[in-house]
Amino acid sequence: MSKLKSSESVRVVVRCRPMNGKEKAASYDKVVDVDVKLGQVSVKNPKGTAHEMPKTFTFDAVYDWNAKQFELYDETFRPLVDSVLQGFNGTIFAYGQTGTGKTYTMEGIRGDPEKRGVIPNSFDHIFTHISRSQNQQYLVRASYLEIYQEEIRDLLSKDQTKRLELKERPDTGVYVKDLSSFVTKSVKEIEHVMNVGNQNRSVGATNMNEHSSRSHAIFVITIECSEVGLDGENHIRVGKLNLVDLAGSERQAKTGAQGERLKEATKINLSLSALGNVISALVDGKSTHIPYRDSKLTRLLQDSLGGNAKTVMVANVGPASYNVEETLTTLRYANRAKNIKNKPRVNEDPKDALLREFQEEIARLKAQLEKRSIGRRKRREKRREGGGSGGGGEEEEEEGEEGEEEGDDKDDYWREQQEKLEIEKRAIVEDHSLVAEEKMRLLKEKEKKMEDLRREKDAAEMLGAKIKAMESKLLVGGKNIVDHTNEQQKILEQKRQEIAEQKRREREIQQQMESRDEETLELKETYSSLQQEVDIKTKKLKKLFSKLQAVKAEIHDLQEEHIKERQELEQTQNELTRELKLKHLIIENFIPLEEKSKIMNRAFFDEEEDHWKLHPITRLENQQMMKRPVSAVGYKRPLSQHARMSMMIRPEARYRAENIVLLELDMPSRTTRDYEGPAIAPKVQAALDAALQDEDEIQVDASSFESTANKKSKARPKSGRKSGSSSSSSGTPASQLYPQSRGLVPK
């Protein structure tokens, strides 16, 4: 049975980082004041008047920029980890704006012992506690996951594209299906697991943070402890420590996020808004519904917020005036979270404890190994009874051998048996009185015995190695408890824890004194004169008036914040309505009514996966259809042995299940012929045809030219050169009618 415990509030601490280089260069003012002793954080309005009172918030503990990592761990987180080691569930998560130091608080700086965060310090704490424990067995497992754009990814898996599903069981609550878990035996191993996961985590650069976490990461450590109770039986306690590093809320105008970074920021802000709504609903006593299912982050933190867990919330803020709105929002949510009530209980004897499975498997293997050793002992006794007439000396030797064998001297036993078989083999080979066949038979028997002996030895060694491997995963403390250094370290840690507890009590007492100061002053006030009474009451009136103004300013800020949230919700609603109208328009115009009604009838909402699905059309849709049975001999139909033999002997169609009639192919007559190429190339043939072609005769009509020449000769005067002139005149038309050779044309 689980031990029930009274409800306790979520413990909330605030940590303020120092001003960074960009804020100093831009000359921003420091508007956050931290009072570590009183546990108060005050925020001044950078745009307000000089008389305006700062807004003050009180928490369980506050830490300024001078706080060390180990101080934060010893005072705030060490008691929670101690509770996990006792069997409670515990959660530590950092909340706040991007760039305020959440990852630094949770992980710190690697390689620097003084700047290690909560996660590495918790590793040392857990394994140191295990090494100092007595009469207890521990099993430590580690898992690492991230929520990136509302998708769960296993950071320790080789396949980073695989998306995991959230499931819920009545006995264990919400869990991640198929999440890998690694058994770790030391701080070095669990740090290696964390480093592998950090390499796969989504990180990006924005204007506000160079190494901004773009996903919510959860490192889960499961510690199982087995201890013998008063009833003499083993009882197992299981504690689970969730170390959550949330991505920071951010505004697009400040971070300059675009493209993929803007999509990431949208999903981050949605999940953080869902977390804020869960916190508000848990604090508000009127809420009947807690919206855990609004995001995967709130579903995973369901036990941590109002459930079976002890929770510490670290609110990280920045001191610059540039981020005053985000700082106030973070402090308001953290102030609300103080009022969340959890009901933690010790998880005793769960059904799915891996430690119990390990113990049962080790016990089974040991019983199997013991059974083998009993079989060997019985065989020795039989051999001893068979050779009992050999005298008392031999019996004494065998008893001595048995004592040695029972004293875990197994190697000597195997060696002795092997040497004995070798001697017997040698004796058979050297014995010339035996027939060759008999000798071979005896040698084979001895070889078989040696092989059986070898197999038995290998099986025993394998069982022993398996037992050692499984026992090595179970951590048992008390081995170094006598060590003086270890004892001194233990005393030192106890003193540090006492100092941290004393500081916490002093802080609580001072807070109570501050709240009761006003009541005591009112009761003890006595006035010596009317003027003194007027002065004191005027002073008190001014103080109350300043408080009234601060409350009015707080109400005004809350109203403005409410208006902004309402406007954002209205904008989201309008976008969703517009998208819904578009989908309805497409359905009405492009999808038939019958198909629409079929889809509407099949649609249902899956609450576990948080989205709509379709019922299968038939019951067998998700099952594999059964195939027709196939013949064992390769035929399409099953055939008997007689039918197969008849088919081979006689080519009859009676016993054939396929290819009953064997026909030759009926080839058609040929309708084409082979191509024959020309004897002479086509270009050469064309040139020859052109050269051998007959040319047409050219006929020239010169009658018109002759009549013209005769007329000219009659018109000329007579002279002594008649013949010459006539020859020249007659030669002129001939030169015009017939072309003359120009000789060789130059290239």
Curated annotation (Swiss-Prot):
Lineage: Eukaryota, Metazoa, Chordata, Craniata, Vertebrata
One Gene Ontology cellular component annotation held by this UniProt entry: plus-end kinesin complex
Subcellular location, principal: cytoplasm
Biased segments, Acidic residues type: 393-411
Superkingdom: Eukaryota
Assembly mode: Heterodimer of KIF3A and KIF3B. KIF3A/KIF3B heterodimer interacts with KIFAP3 forming a heterotrimeric (KIF3A/KIF3B/KIFAP3) complex. Interacts directly with IFT20. Interacts with the SMC3 subunit of the cohesin complex. Interacts with FLCN.
Keywords: Acetylation, ATP-binding, Cell projection, Ciliopathy, Coiled coil, Cytoplasm, Cytoskeleton, Disease variant, Microtubule, Motor protein, Nucleotide-binding, Retinitis pigmentosa, Synapse
Biased composition, class Polar residues, residue ranges: 701-710
Compartments, record wording: Cytoplasm, Cytoskeleton; Cell projection, Cilium; Cell projection, Dendritic spine
Modified residues (N-acetylserine): 2
MF terms (GO), sorted A to Z: ATP binding; ATP hydrolysis activity; intraciliary transport particle B binding; microtubule binding; microtubule motor activity; plus-end-directed microtubule motor activity; small GTPase binding
Described function: Microtubule-based molecular motor that transport intracellular cargos, such as vesicles, organelles and protein complexes. Uses ATP hydrolysis to generate force to bind and move along the microtubule. Plays a role in cilia formation. Involved in photoreceptor integrity and opsin trafficking in rod photoreceptors. Transports vesicles containing N-methyl-D-aspartate (NMDA) receptor subunit GRIN2A into neuronal dendrites.
Compositional bias of kind Low complexity: 722-735
SUPFAM superfamilies to which the protein is assigned, alphabetical: P-loop containing nucleoside triphosphate hydrolases
Domain Kinesin motor: 9-340
UniProt GO BP: anterograde axonal transport; anterograde dendritic transport of neurotransmitter receptor complex; cilium assembly; determination of left/right symmetry; intraciliary transport; microtubule-based movement; mitotic centrosome separation; mitotic spindle assembly
Disease implicated: Retinitis pigmentosa 89: A form of retinitis pigmentosa, a retinal dystrophy belonging to the group of pigmentary retinopathies. Retinitis pigmentosa is characterized by retinal pigment deposits visible on fundus examination and primary loss of rod photoreceptor cells followed by secondary loss of cone photoreceptors. Patients typically have night vision blindness and loss of midperipheral visual field. RP89 is an autosomal dominant form associated with features of ciliopathy, including postaxial polydactyly, and renal and hepatic disease.
Protein name in the entry: Kinesin-like protein KIF3B
Xref: Pfam families: Kinesin
Record gene name: KIF3B
Globular: annotated segments: 580-747
Start-end of Basic residues biased regions: 711-721
Annotated InterPro entries: Kinesin-like_fam (IPR027640), Kinesin_motor_CS (IPR019821), Kinesin_motor_dom (IPR001752), Kinesin_motor_dom_sf (IPR036961), P-loop_NTPase (IPR027417)
Binding residue positions for ATP: 96-103
